[in-house]
Amino acid sequence: MARPLRILVTAFGPFPGVPLNPSQRAAIDLLRLRRPAVSDVEITLEILPTRWDELPRLDALLNRRRFDAVLLLGAAARRQQVCLETRAVNAVRDFPDAAGRHPPGRRIMPQGLDALASTAPALARVASLRRAGIMASASRDAGRYLCNAAYFHALVAAHGQAWGKDVAPPVLFVHLPGRSGVPRGTSRTGLARALSGLLVALVAQARRRNACGPGLRRSAREPRPDTAPA
């Protein structure tokens, strides 16, 4: 019998200026919802400490469990809409983490690519959020802090899982706006339902990917992940 799909949902703990991270609350709200479409899926919630020295822990989790899809949540206090990040860049800003420590260098992975595009169709997901009444947009700038760094690490792991398949597992980062993480005109419940829709879409994409044998290419009906030049 085939193993159930493994899905990872991540959020962040507190960091300087944000004592209660809204992404953590949103992730908990999301997983409290009943979702018949993913009732057979094994979902892991990981609250990531907002620390540069904790990134190896994320790597270890990704490499050990080999997730079929990853949904990462983070907070962006200055944004007004839910932002779906189309890429992660291999660069960091010299800003202290929750422990007061600074990043070890100016690049996340010194020998890595300059940028990696999301392996999920972010633009299509933005459209679905808007249809649900959520203020949402696509973004090419996930920042140069730990949100972007975690995204880059998750995308590197996903590309390492591609093996003989044409596509890597879907990985998507969502930035939640403002201090509350809830966009104007939306309730916490409404946001949780919208994030649930994203999760269901990622699961569907993972099912299609796993149904393809080695070397089989994407169906013409499969949305192509958004390309994002470096």
Spans of model-derived segments:
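An accessory alpha-helical subdomain
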Residues: 171, 175-180
